Structure formats: C-alpha cells, structure tokens
Amino acid sequence: MKLDTSGLESTAPIFRRSDFVFDGLQMTPSFDLPNPTDFDGFQKEAVQMVKPAKGTTTLAFIFKHGVMVAADSRASMGGYISSQSVKKIIEINPYMLGTMAGGAADCQFWHRNLGIKCRLHELANKRRISVTGASKLLANILYNYRGMGLSVGTMIAGWDETGPGLYYVDSEGGRLKGMRFSVGSGSPYAYGVLDNGYKYDMTVEEASELARRAIYHATYRDGASGGVVSVYHVGPDGWKKVTGDDVGDLHFQYYPVVPATVEQEMVEVVGA
C-alpha cells in the first residue's frame, strides 16, 4: 500500500538571499568598525568632536612637614568663563587629595570612582591604601580608556605609612613620581615662582604662602585661570584647608596701590 503524503508538505514560503528582506538589509547604511590590529590608527582617522580649549592652574609639592596642594577655581570653555567657583581639589579620603585639570566631568567622575575603590580596599585589607597604590590604581584604569577622548591631568597627594607622597597621572595612563608638579595652562607661570622659592625645610606658613603666590601669579598672566586660590596641607593627621583667597584681594596684597605724586611746575609768563 502506498501512503498519500501530499497533505504533509509544507506550504510556508522559503526566502532566499535574493528576496526583498535580504535586499533591504543590504541597503541599510552601515559604519566602519575599528580594525582590532590597529585601533590607535582607527582613532586618529576618526572625525573628532569639537573640544573647546580648557585652562586651569594646579600645583603640589612635598616639603618637610607634608604636602602642600593649591589650585584656582575658574572653569572655562574656550574664551567663555563658565564658573568662578569650581572646587578643583577633591578629597579622596581623609589623608589623600586629588587635583583637577582637563575635562571637569572626567576628573570629577574618576576621582569619585577612585575614592570608592580606596574605601573598598580599606574595608577588605583593614588598612588605608598607600598613595603609591592609589595613583597606580587610577593610572591602570585610565590606561584602559586611552584614545577614547578622556581629558584628565591630575595629581594624587597624600600621607601614608611611608610619609608624604605625590604622583602625577594623566588620561593616557602615564604616572610620574616627583617632589613638585604644576598642571594646567597656567603651569609655566606657576613653575617660575615655585622653582624660585621652593625649599624643602620650609615651615607650613612659608609653604602655604609660596603655593598661594604661585597660583596668584599664574592667574595674573593666564586668562583661563582665576577666581579663588585654595591651599590645602596634607600632614600626618590628614589634610586641612589652609586658605581660600580671592585673586582680586591678593592682587592688592602683592601689588599695593601707591598714590602718585603730581608735581606742578610753575612757569613764569613774561608779558610783551
């Protein structure tokens, strides 16, 4: 007996590559994917977004009694001053500070992220993270995002079991250890004052005055720096804010107004 299987045949349509569905997919606009063997080259060839010029002045240096950290408070986008009250010295923990230079959002986010990781390290290991460890942690994080448009130039300053520590970290993952740094568009002017007046055996008062004067002179010459000069001291007992002075008041302190003397010359007129 032969069974009739004609009723079991499928009547569903079979789409081939040439059908309209696949033709529509082929017409969909696409974009280039990065070459995994030359990712950095792909980033260089990509069209960059408009990035307004940024500017700031921050500095930090190690001396006999700890680390002195100072910064201005102006935020700018190109020639536009967007704020005069930005907090550019960020408290990571009670014994460690970070500075902001570059993109405000990038610096604030990654400092906040670093503070969380430092706290988790403290809870897991029952001891505070060292300045060396915190700076290395931030550098490793930023290195993973290199070439992705981050703008970060920060200093990590603090006090740990080994004493004072100071590191510079940038958005490419670079990390430098040093005794004094200045970062930002006003740093060339700040370096001039800092290098001229720096001594390791300064008192806290002398160090804070040097930091304040260096930031002020940078704001005097650099249009992207200004606002308020904030100075912090990091010592064995943690960080403490020393001063916060408006640069306008500091101008009259460093350059006091001296009344000009007007000399009147008497001229005898001889009549004809």
From Swiss-Prot:
* Family to which this protein belongs: Belongs to the peptidase T1B family.
GO CC, sorted alphabetically, is: cytosol; nucleus; proteasome core complex, beta-subunit complex
| Complex and partners | The 26S proteasome consists of a 20S proteasome core and two 19S regulatory subunits. The 20S proteasome core is composed of 28 subunits that are arranged in four stacked rings, resulting in a barrel-shaped structure. The two end rings are each formed by seven alpha subunits, and the two central rings are each formed by seven beta subunits. The catalytic chamber with the active sites is on the inside of the barrel.
GO annotation, biological process = proteasome-mediated ubiquitin-dependent protein catabolic process
Name of the protein in its database record: Proteasome subunit beta type-5
Classify the source by domain of life.
Eukaryota
Cross-referenced SUPFAM superfamilies: N-terminal nucleophile aminohydrolases (Ntn hydrolases) (SSF56235)
- Cell location: Cytoplasm; Nucleus
| PROSITE patterns, sorted | PROTEASOME_BETA_1 (PS00854), PROTEASOME_BETA_2 (PS51476)
Record's Pfam families?
Proteasome
